[in-house]
Design a protein with these regions (language model features):
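Bacterial N-terminal signal peptides that target proteins for export
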Residues: 2-13
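Bacterial N-terminal signal peptides
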Residues: 11-22
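Low-complexity, acidic/polar, glycine-enriched regions of mature
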Residues: 23-206
Length: 206
């Protein structure tokens, strides 16, 4: 006895299969190349008697999205191009820049780059996320966590965040009361602040 197949059901069955696969099969990953001209990273370091501010360029970077959410990525910071923006006097500005590049701070002759590698991105609400990752400065790597706002569309990904970094975890101890006594008003606070704006443009599917 031959079983007759009702051909009218085939389109419905195929539609059901494709609908199921849409839930099972993840969307293709997409790479986003960091736009180093549109991206910015500024810093503020504070001491007992005041503070200083500046900027440091992002030299390269790549992010990976699943089509909706940022999943992984990394970027590199050019410490040799670090600048100070709050000292107008040319000599005073150059003196502070030189000191920050010295071994007392970032030691850029030996360690010209800093890097950040994303470990996880956890949604909170709307465009707000918690980002965890590994920050490497002066050859030392530590995991940091910070809140970020991430706006994602088909062609561009923009992330903004305020990040607090404890410099002593990266062997930058100059002027730290945590390690030196009797510093008085020459003490420099252990934590410095970063204000990040990361802009990346989609390349192609992986």
């Amino acid at each position: 006895m031959k079983t007759k197949i009702n051909l009218n059901y085939i389109p419905l069955a195929m539609a059901a299969i494709f609908a199921l696969l849409a839930f099972i099969v993840p969307p293709p990953a997409a790479k986003f190349k960091v736009d180093t001209k549109a991206s910015t990273l500024t810093w503020v370091g504070k001491k007992i008697t005041g503070q200083h501010a500046g900027a440091v360029p992002i030299s390269t970077g790549e992010l990976v999205s699943d089509g909706k959410l940022l999943k992984e990525g990394s970027f590199e910071i050019d410490l040799n191009a670090l600048t100070v923006t709050d000292i107008a006097d040319k000599d005073g500005n150059a003196k502070l820049v030189g000191h920050l590049k010295s071994d007392d701070f970032f030691g850029t002759t030996k360690f010209p780059k800093a890097t950040f590698v994303i470990s996880s991105v956890t949604p909170k609400s709307g465009n707000d996320y918690t980002v965890k990752g590994k920050l490497t400065i002066k050859g030392k790597t530590n995991e940091i966590e910070f809140p970020a706002t991430i706006v994602h569309d088909a062609k561009k990904l923009t992330a903004t965040a305020k990040i607090v970094v404890d410099r002593t975890k990266f062997d930058i101890r100059y002027g730290s009361k945590s390690f030196f006594d009797n510093l008085g008003d020459k003490a420099i606070y252990d934590e410095f602040e970063l204000d990040l704006k990361l802009v990346a443009n989609q390349q192609s599917g992986i």
